[in-house]
Amino acid sequence: MKFSSKQRKDVLNGVNKQELDVIVIGGGITGSGIALDGATRGLSTIVFEMQDFAAGTSSRSTKLVHGGLRYLKQLEVKMVAEVGKERAIVYENGPHVTTPEWMLLPFHTGGTFGSFSTSIGLRVYDFLAGVKRSERRKMFNREETLNKEPLVKKEGLKGGGYYVEYRTDDARLTIEVMKEAIEHGAKAVNYAKVDGFLYKDGKVCGVRVIDLLDGEVYEVYGKKIVNAAGPWVDTLREKDNSKKGKVLQLSKGVHLVIDQKRFPLGQAIYFDTPDKRMVFAIPRGGKTYVGTTDTFYDKDAAVPQMTTEDRTYIINAINYMFPSVKITEKDIESSWAGVRPLIYEEGKSASEISRKDEIWTSESGLITIAGGKLTGYRKMAEMVVDYVTNLLQKEGHSAYPKSTTKHMPISGGHVDGSKGLPAFIAKKAGEGTKYGLTTAQAEEFAKFYGSNVDILFDLAKKHKDEAKEYNMPLDVLIPLVYAMDYEMTAKPVDFFVRRRGAVFFNIHWVYEWKEAVINYMAAKLGWSKEEQMKYTAELEKALTDAVVPVDQQEQAAALA
C-alpha cells in the first residue's frame, strides 16, 4: 500500500514545511516521467496534481505511442527521428500497456497521400524511426488494401501503405510511470492544487498547496520547482508574474466510440477527411474509436467537451471513408475530448502548430516544460532532469548520475520485455483459479496489470468475503481495491475513467457497477453523505459528457 488514497494526508503532512530537491507541478505523463527520472537519480521529488493523475491531456489523447508520420509533411525530421525511436523504448518498458498495431493508410485519387509519396514517406519514416525489419512498411495495391479492410471506400481507391504504430492506454501508462517513481522514492498526491509560490530574495523557493478534498493548506519548499502542468503552465506563469515571450495555444481534440456491431472495423486505419486532414479509426476491445478533431480552444481546460459540431465532423469523416457503415449520432456509445497544450505560432492553424517541447526559465527560477507529446515523455523528462541537475551542480551540489530510464521497466512492466509477456500471461492465467478467479479473469488481470498481477491475486484471497458483503464479483472488487490502495484512487470517477478506461470503452459496465463501487469507496474512505452525493454527481456528469454534446446540455438546462 505504498500509493494508497488512504495515505494522501500522510504524504501532505510529511512534506509540510520541508524542503525537497524538486517539486513537480502536474501529474500527467510529463510530470510522472520527471518524477521517475529524478527519483532514480537520487533527487528527493514530489508531484502535486490538482485533479487526478492523467486527468488532463494524458487520459484524453488518441492513445497511440506513435512516430508522427504526419510531421514528415511538415518536414519535422528531427522530431520524427527522436519520437520514432522512443516508441520501441516505451513499448519494451511497459508491454502490458503498449502494443504494436499495424496501421493501414489507404490512398485515393486526389487524397493527401499518393502511392509514390506514401511509399517514400513510409520508407523515410522507417529509416528515421529505426524501425525493426519485421515492422517495416509494406505497400498494397487496391485489392490487397480491400482484403485488409473491406469497409474502406472503393471509389477512387488506388492502394495503401501498411506500417506499425503502437497503441497504448495513456492514463494507464501515466499511472504505471508514477507508480515506478514511487517505488524509487518519489512522492505524489492528487487533488493537491498549487495555488501560489513562495519566494526568498526574489527567487522561487516553494509552493502553497491546497488539498482540494478538505481545504487544508500546506507550504512545501523545493530547491527547484518544475511547472509541468500541461494546459495550465501559463496559469502558473501568471502567478509567478513571468507569462511573457512564448505562450501556449490550446487545441481541442475529440474522439468518438462506436460498438463493433455497428462499425466492424478489423484493421486500424489512418485516413483522409473531406477537408484534407487525417484521422485515425482504431479497433479496441469490441469497440472502434475514431478521432481526432483539431480546433483552437479558449474555454475551461479542465472540462473540454464534445460539441454537436465535433460529433458531426467525425461522423461525416467516418461515412466519407467507410460509406457502407452509415453511422449516425444514435450509434455513438461514448466519446472523450482533450486539450493539447501547443506552443503558440503566429498565423498557423491548430493542425499546423508544432508538437515540439521547450524548457522556459523565469527570472525567479521557475522552470516550465511546455508542449511535447505522449510518445516523447521519457526523453522530455530526461531533458528536464538534466537541466535541473546542471543547475544544482552549478550551485555547489555534487554531481548526479545520468538518466537510466531508457532500459527501466515501468510498474507492471517487469515481465522480461515484450518477448517475455506472452509466457508471463499464460503462466498467470493458469494460477488465477487458486484465488477464486476464472482462467479468463486471471488472464485479463495479467494482460491489464502486468507484473503487478500477483498483488491482485493476493487481494482476491483476502477480500473474498467482502465481495459477497458488497455484492460485487471479484473481477470488479479486486481492481477497485487495487486502484484505491496502490494507485491513489480517491473518487469513483478516477476508477471508472482513468484506472479502468470504462467510461470510454465499456460504459454499460459503469452503469452496472457504479452504485456498488460508490458504496464501497464511501465505506472505506469514510465519506459523509454530502461527499458521497458530490462524488456520485461527478461520475454522472462524466457519463453525460461522454454521450451528450455540451451545446445540447446547455440548451436542455436553459429550458429546464
What does each of the following model-derived ranges do?
Residues 18-20, 214-224:
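Core beta-strand elements of the Rossmann-like FAD/NAD(P) dinucleotide-binding domain
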Residues 27-28, 50:
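Glycine-rich Rossmann-fold phosphate-binding loop(s) that bind the pyrophosphate
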Residues 63-148:
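Dinucleotide-binding Rossmann-like beta1-alpha1 core, especially the glycine-rich loop
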